[in-house]
């Protein structure tokens, strides 16, 4: 039955003590059928106590009536608990008052049930028992040799074969903090060359285990030292401010190809160069190729900066080339305006970049070659 699951069957015994023989027999049959217990019936409480005194260890459950003429049920419960402390007693009574229930529990009974007992009460009776105690009794019987022979044979066959041959099992030593402390103490006294077992004073430990642990200890020390040195080096790098001065930032500016076709109307940009570190002639050539102009305010100290502008081409202004005779470098300021004729401007740029007509002599005026546009008419 589903309600009887978990009940230890087979080897458990019970006693029923009731002066009403008819009720005692019916209770015995129901316990045997529902719980599968071995039941013994007594109509005399004195005889039941004599049986418990001789075989108290073999009885696991007792059902006793409270209203008995030969001996009161409370007195029977008290004596039975003195004979066998772990015995479990369930009291039966026709009157289940609060006083009766409290008295039974105080004397050590599990529960008080109402007479007469029916099948439902018997089925739920095992729920009030201490199943752990009953299972422990069954385990004790099994250890004494009571049990299924086939089960014992299977358990014997499950052992490893090396135990049948009589070989010893291999044990592993666990280095607890206490053993580690003794190991380090011996290491400080004798050094890494040798560690005496007498100093450690530990049983069940040999030299092989100590040497193996010593190798592991050395590896751990190497790891700690390498980690400490790496951490120290990284801290020095971060704390040294001079290391930051070696960091340089270089920026590369991409400019369009000088021969690519630019739109007719372009935005003019001011192209400033460092006169002290760059050649002015190269700067002029690069400015003409890029279609940009130099800022004249950078060369305000030039004595030739006030020269008149020369008219070239179609009448557009071309700033005269100014030469700084006082310094080692000369300055050239060129202003190019983009006319409607883009091809004409490109032709001027090509002639200037490839021409060698512009000759500059240091300490004197530069010879300026002017570009003149000749008309196709013969009159000019």
UniProtKB/Swiss-Prot annotation:
Residues 228-245 have a biased composition (Polar residues). It comes from the Eukaryota. CDD domains: REC_typeB_ARR-like. Two-component system major event consists of a His-to-Asp phosphorelay between a sensor histidine kinase (HK) and a response regulator (RR). In plants, the His-to-Asp phosphorelay involves an additional intermediate named Histidine-containing phosphotransfer protein (HPt). This multistep phosphorelay consists of a His-Asp-His-Asp sequential transfer of a phosphate group between first a His and an Asp of the HK protein, followed by the transfer to a conserved His of the HPt protein and finally the transfer to an Asp in the receiver domain of the RR protein. Keywords: Activator, Cytokinin signaling pathway, DNA-binding, Nucleus, Phosphoprotein, Transcription, Transcription regulation, Two-component regulatory system. The modification 4-aspartylphosphate is found at residue 65. Disulfide bonds: none annotated. SMART domains: REC. Residues 13-130 form the Response regulatory domain. Residues 169-223 bind DNA. GO terms for molecular function: DNA binding. It is found in: Nucleus. PROSITE patterns: RESPONSE_REGULATORY. Residues 225-245 are annotated as: Disordered. One of its GO terms (biological process) is cytokinin-activated signaling pathway. Belongs to the ARR family. Type-B subfamily. Transcriptional activator that binds specific DNA sequence. Functions as a response regulator involved in His-to-Asp phosphorelay signal transduction system. Phosphorylation of the Asp residue in the receiver domain activates the ability of the protein to promote the transcription of target genes. May directly activate some type-A response regulators in response to cytokinins. This is Two-component response regulator ORR28.
